[in-house]
A protein has these predicted regions:
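Transmembrane-helix signature of polytopic, membrane-embedded enzymes
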Residues: 10-16, 81-92, 124-146, 179-188, ...
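Signature aromatic-anchored transmembrane alpha helix within multi-pass, membrane-resident enzymes
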Residues: 15-16, 208-215, 238-247, 357, ...
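Short helix- or helix-capping micro-motifs
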Residues: 17, 140-145, 172, 193, ...
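Interfacial juxtamembrane loops and adjacent helix segments
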Residues: 54-112, 262-326
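Transmembrane-helix motifs of polytopic, lipid-linked glycan transferases
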Residues: 111-131, 169, 173, 354
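Membrane-interface transmembrane helices that cradle and orient dolichyl/undecaprenyl
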Residues: 170-186, 220
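C-terminal luminal/periplasmic domains and tails of membrane-associated envelope-modifying transferases
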Residues: 280-285, 313-321, 451-555
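Hydrophobic, aromatic-rich transmembrane alpha-helices
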Residues: 336, 341-364
Length: 555
């Protein structure tokens, strides 16, 4: 790391890492059938592309879904007649009944996620490079590429890598705007923030708490080391960035215009969100909305925010450390990060972020403090506010920030430690991180570190280990090799089992012990531990990470 990296060499290394990451993701496509959310995401995007309607699970905005739908749309995938009112069913129709094959449609949709992976890697590299140098930026990017959870979720049609990528880009551009509040910086900030919010609504609180933390630090640091804040210019450029971000978010739903109410002023949740539930503004908004059609985004964005708020308020069935709960646990995400993060990244990342914070505070340098401040702000918000505890994927943004900390610490220690033994230790940690990809391939999404093994199913399940029986294809092959003619199946997922090459099967119901061949997903077991507790007496065979296979002889 004493090497003087030229800009050309640095960019070349970045390109190589990006190509490697994308190649590893693509190589897993044929291993796994569809994960739980993939059919609905594809259907939602395709209906918007084809018909200008946004129908399914509208708590999620459409940007990532649109990119997932473009490939299948160009391959001829369409929903004929009135779309199925259930998004999962509509998605299954597209996967199994399109001119292109199931594999082609699913692959084309998943390829739509790779641009977000590239944005994530480039943003992490650019942010680290700007304030920590070439060596730290490449080391950080290497750590991020070697994080199985990142590659696992980038290989699936889901919204978590997209929102992580666009939020990282927005935070980087925000710091550039802090440096110099130019109109160009404001336009870039507005565009990236709009795309982040259009990827997933969680970008709003993540960016909000990060901005609040950075502004608080800025105020404290200004008191210690006064600098010109250029307040009038900042207000103007910030207003432009805010308006542009809202316009991008609204425009992502397309040009279709709708009336938010009618002549009878039928109650509208969107209008009530925008103008209040009573008062002069409420009355005026209803009169105008009954006569003037507005872009579809004015209807859908409020519904998205209200949907997420409702979901969070009412909670979601969650599992952690053998316990289930509806409203989750404040410590869910720290535990999830502790068992889902490669140990070199976890240890070096946390220590590196702490080093960044100490150095930034001592030198009154906001830009060196920023990664640690954003990490702490987002994780604290998730712990205190979120009741939707269904996977580390909801805080994936922690990983690029940890990678920045790890990259900075490796370079700092390499330069301080002159001994070969010290350099060997650091090189060993980097190699350990990189080797994780080889040892866990292709089960990146279901990765657990040494803390979580050998029984990860006792710690986390939903979308961390089993996300809709993703190993169904592996099960099909195992049953074929064993010559199984019939079996019992306990399955929680969204594949069309009638279209899969499975032997004859019957549903495995809870509380009804049976004999013969039994296949059951870990999510099925976790959601009804009492009903399937009788299986604990038998030793299963693992099929991938999401299925248990039993053979129980009759009496």
């Amino acid at each position: 790391l004493q090497i003087r990296w030229s800009p050309r060499r640095s960019v070349g290394a970045l390109i190589a890492l990006c190509v490697l990451a994308c190649a590893l993701c693509v190589s897993t496509y044929r291993v796994f059938g569809n994960f739980w959310d993939e059919p609905e995401h594809i259907a939602a995007g395709l209906v918007l592309v084809d018909r200008g309607q946004y129908l399914y699970d509208n708590q999620h905005p459409p940007f990532a879904r649109l990119l997932a739908a473009i490939g299948p749309y160009l391959a001829g995938a369409r929903l004929h007649g009135d779309p199925n009112p259930i998004g999962e069913a509509a998605g299954r129709d597209l996967l199994y009944h399109s001119p292109a094959s199931y594999d082609e449609i699913l692959t084309l949709a998943r390829l739509g996620m790779l641009p977000f992976l590239l944005v994530l890697l480039i943003s992490t590299w650019s942010w680290t490079r700007r304030w920590y140098g070439e060596a730290a930026s490449l080391t950080a990017t290497l750590f991020l590429v070697a994080t199985p959870v990142i590659l696992g979720h980038a290989s699936v049609v889901a919204l978590d890598v997209p929102v992580t990528a666009m939020s990282m880009l927005t935070l980087y551009v925000l710091l550039r705007w802090f440096e110099a509040p130019t109109w160009r910086a404001a336009l870039c900030l507005g565009l990236s923030a709009g795309l982040a919010m259009a990827s997933k609504i969680s970008a709003i609180p993540f960016l909000g708490v990060s901005l609040a933390g950075l502004l608080l630090l800025r105020a404290v640091l200004l008191a210690r080391a006064p600098l010109s804040w250029q307040l009038p210019r900042r207000i103007g450029t910030a207003a432009v960035a805010l308006l542009l971000s809202v316009a991008v978010l609204l425009g992502m739903y397309g040009p279709r215009r709708v009336y938010l109410t009618d002549a009878q002023h039928t109650p509208s949740r969107s209008l009530d969100f925008l103008a209040g539930s009573h008062g002069v503004l409420h009355e005026l908004a209803y009169r105008l909305a009954a006569q003037v059609p507005l872009p579809l985004g004015f209807k859908m964005v409020p519904l998205s925010i209200l949907g997420v708020e409702f979901h969070n308020t009412h909670g979601h069935n969650s599992f952690l450390l053998g316990q289930t709960a509806l409203n989750g646990w404040w410590y869910f995400y720290p535990v999830a990060l502790a068992v889902k993060t490669p140990l070199p990244l976890l240890l070096l990342g946390l220590a590196g972020l702490a080093l960044m914070a100490v150095r930034g505070w001592r030198t009154a340098n906001l830009y060196r403090l920023a990664p640690a401040a954003c990490f702490a702000s987002i994780l604290l918000f998730a712990c205190l506010y979120s009741h939707i505890n269904i996977g580390v994927r909801h805080v994936l943004i922690a990983y690029p920030l940890l990678a920045m900390g790890a990259g900075n610490l490796i370079v700092t220690l390499w330069q301080r430690w002159r001994s070969r033994a010290g350099h060997a230790v650091l090189a060993g940690l980097v190699l350990w991180e990189a080797a994780t990809l080889a040892f866990t391939y292709p089960d990146y999404l279901a990765y657990f570190n040494l803390i979580g093994e050998p029984h990860p199913e006792r710690i986390l399940v939903d979308s961390d280990l089993d996300w809709g029986g993703q190993d169904l294809r592996r099960l099909e092959k195992v049953l074929a090799v064993r010559g199984v003619q019939q079996f019992w199946l306990g399955y929680r997922g969204t594949a069309d089992l009638s279209r899969e090459p499975l032997p004859h099967f019957q549903s495995l119901l809870p509380g009804q012990p049976v004999t013969g061949w039994i296949a059951i997903t870990l999510l099925t077991l976790q959601e009804n531990q009492a009903g399937y507790g009788w299986l604990d007496r038998y030793q299963p065979e693992h099929v991938g990470k999401s299925f248990y296979l039993y053979h129980i002889p009759g009496n």
